Amino acid sequence: MANFDIDDFLRNLTPCPGVYRMLDAKGKVLYVGKAKNLKRRIKSYFRNSKLAPKIHVLVKQICDIKITVTHTENEALILESNLIKALQPRYNVLLRDDKSYPYIFLSADDFPRLGFHRGVKQVSGQYFGPYPNIRSVWQTLKLLQRVFPVRQCEDNFYRNRSRPCLQYQIKRCTAPCVGLISKKDYSQDIQHVVMFLKGRDQQVINELVIRMEEASGQLAFEQAAYYRDRIASLRQIQARQYISGEKKDIDVLGVALTEKMACVEVFFIRGGHNLGNKTFLPKLEGNLTPEELLSTFIAQYYLNRETPPILILSHQPKDMGLLTEVLSKQAGRKIALIKPVRGPKVQWIKMALANAKINLNQHLAEKSNITARFKSLQQLLSLANFPQRIECFDVSHIQGTATVASCVVFDREGPRKADYRRFNITGIIPGDDYGALRQALMRRFKKKEGVFPDLLVIDGGKGQINQSLRVLKEIGITEITVLGIAKGPERKAGNETLFLAGYENPVMVTSDSPALHILQHIRDEAHRFAIVSHRKRRAKGGKLSLLEGISGLGPKRRRKLLIQLGGLQEITRAGVEDLAQIEGISLELAQRIYDVFHR
């Protein structure tokens, strides 16, 4: 604060609502906040002797404050949320997982398709969700397909069918692609799907019971049995997912908190069904109350995101009225934030709180273990500072083909999978591991973007270390410590040899060392990720090479085949007649293509 005159700053500061950004000596944003009265709020940081220790540490680092005036406090709340997401300031509560959530999508076609969707809702149709993860979407789609045989195939596959596919044979689809069901009957199935996804499953069951009784009365026992099985399946799903007599869309939020770590558990209730839950572990700096944490979480998580009509909260934020107003305006309808004190909603909160506490305790135990191992690693390698970020590179190939390099990232929280990177290596001599490593490191560090690691771990010995040092020197990076971890005899864990850049002799370490354990963990994770990436590349490349080896199938025909059928997977699933319908593909050529993938 040596060069920052707070008195002069406050003299010229407006009492209007707005957002403030506190910066350090390097111009890096330390904290973003909102205020109904900017002058009063910022003044409180410098005139209040009862500030929390975290705030004292923050204030000492402030060298500048930037403000943005807004018309209303509502606008300030929205701007604050957007700036926190964009700038990731150290002293704000930060959500590490801000991915878009998956939905079940029902297309607007004449014969609609059920499928998975994530991202911007650009395609016309109906969206149901959000679901907490991809797995819960696929589980629901699988259940729906068993009860309502509505198509789930991609449009390219659907349009090019000349006969029913396997899904029809196993009674998971009614084959609208070849006209085996009328539009009226198919629409009835679609109506039932929509009713079910909106929580009106009992109404669907009632309709199916009427149909079953009608079929039985007409002595159509096979049809009656068909409806009976559907009803039984729906009741099984009800028993598994049902949570409430209220057929509403609700999110239930529970908070568990310690001095430096927090957990927010969100349960997704849609139409009375529990779709599952998701755990959030926000990054904290200093003490917060559960109410403050929940306020920040709601602003970051629900602004610019679809919000259900009701949020049930374990704690009541002070600015609940402001949050309600802003979220309602964003949604174009009333959003209710409720802190229940009695009734069934209290049981939902107990469920969310119990899960939040369990997940927080589990994460605390894991973090304590990782922190101890990082500390041991710092001591083993005589690092000046505690390692905040470790990156590990590994190269994978089979006899020099489809070479892939992986980069995994660990910090004191464990693996940061959002930062993992895969590099498809090209233009090298087959089997040249040094060349592959050089290319991967160049692509990772050349632009000097993102956060650099304190420690760079290479799966290999002195040769790989020297190659890494040459690349870093060429780029102009000198502050990264480089460590090689070479496999021991027979590749047994515990027999690894560690080589630290700049030292001739290996680092002496015992097999029970926590430092060695964390390095093994990171190395194994890099190896796993490299193998998975390599398999994906090899599988794709293998199928493409199979196409290239088919006599009479040149580049133009291959391209037409891929476009019209919608990719390699659809080509492998297509029959001879389907292939022959593509322009330029004769029946004889179609047979050759089919034979290649069905030997």
Swiss-Prot record:
UniProt domain UVR: residue ranges: 202-237
GO MF entries: DNA binding; excinuclease ABC activity
Predominant cellular place of this UniProt entry's protein: cytoplasm
Assigned keywords, A-Z: Cytoplasm, DNA damage, DNA excision, DNA repair, Excision nuclease, SOS response
Domain of life the protein comes from: Bacteria
Any one Gene Ontology BP term: nucleotide-excision repair
Protein role: The UvrABC repair system catalyzes the recognition and processing of DNA lesions. UvrC both incises the 5' and 3' sides of the lesion. The N-terminal half is responsible for the 3' incision and the C-terminal half is responsible for the 5' incision.
Cross-referenced PANTHER family: UVRABC SYSTEM PROTEIN C, UVRC/OXIDOREDUCTASE
Name of protein: UvrABC system protein C
Organism name: Nitrosococcus oceani (strain ATCC 19707 / BCRC 17464 / JCM 30415 / NCIMB 11848 / C-107)
Taxonomy of the source species: Bacteria, Pseudomonadati, Pseudomonadota, Gammaproteobacteria, Chromatiales
